[in-house]
């Protein structure tokens, strides 16, 4: 079951991927975005991941302390991003 946080983060990722103008195949995947969706399937590279992280930081008023190389190895799918943000928000609460 998708909770509010996961739904919001999926929305942030969809907006970023759509604004980057992926191809038709990527658009189909974006329409069916779930926690299991791999970032590479969305056409997200390390720069795109940095943009997504920035978008999430702005949306939640948090700072994600990791360099792009660490993020790229740790955050492989949408669920990984949701889990990382959930952990940061829980710490801050």
From Swiss-Prot:
Q: Does the keyword Magnesium apply?
A: no
Q: Which residues carry this modification: O-(pantetheine 4'-phosphoryl)serine?
A: 46
Post-translational note:
4'-phosphopantetheine is transferred from CoA to a specific serine of apo-NodF.
**Sequence ranges assigned to domain Carrier in this UniProt record:** 4-89
Q: Which UniProt keywords apply?
A: Nodulation, Phosphopantetheine, Phosphoprotein, Plasmid
Q: Which InterPro entries match?
A: ACP-like_sf (IPR036736), PP-bd_ACP (IPR009081), Ppantetheine_attach_site (IPR006162)
Q: What is this protein for, i.e. what is its function? A: Proposed to synthesize nod factor fatty acyl chain. Involved in trans-2,trans-4,trans-6,cis-11-octadecatetraenoic acid biosynthesis.
State what protein this is by name: Nodulation protein F
Q: Which organism is it from?
A: Rhizobium meliloti (strain 1021) (Ensifer meliloti)
Q: Which gene encodes it?
A: nodF
């Amino acid at each position: 079951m998708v909770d509010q946080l996961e739904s919001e983060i999926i929305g942030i990722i969809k907006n970023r991927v759509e604004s980057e103008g992926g191809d038709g195949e990527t658009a189909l995947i974006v329409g069916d975005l779930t926690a299991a969706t791999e970032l590479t399937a969305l056409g997200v590279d390390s720069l795109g991941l940095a943009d997504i992280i920035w978008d999430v930081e702005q949306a939640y008023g948090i700072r994600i302390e990791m360099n792009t190389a660490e993020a790229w190895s740790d955050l492989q799918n949408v669920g990984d991003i949701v889990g990382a943000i959930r952990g940061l928000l829980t710490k801050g609460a």
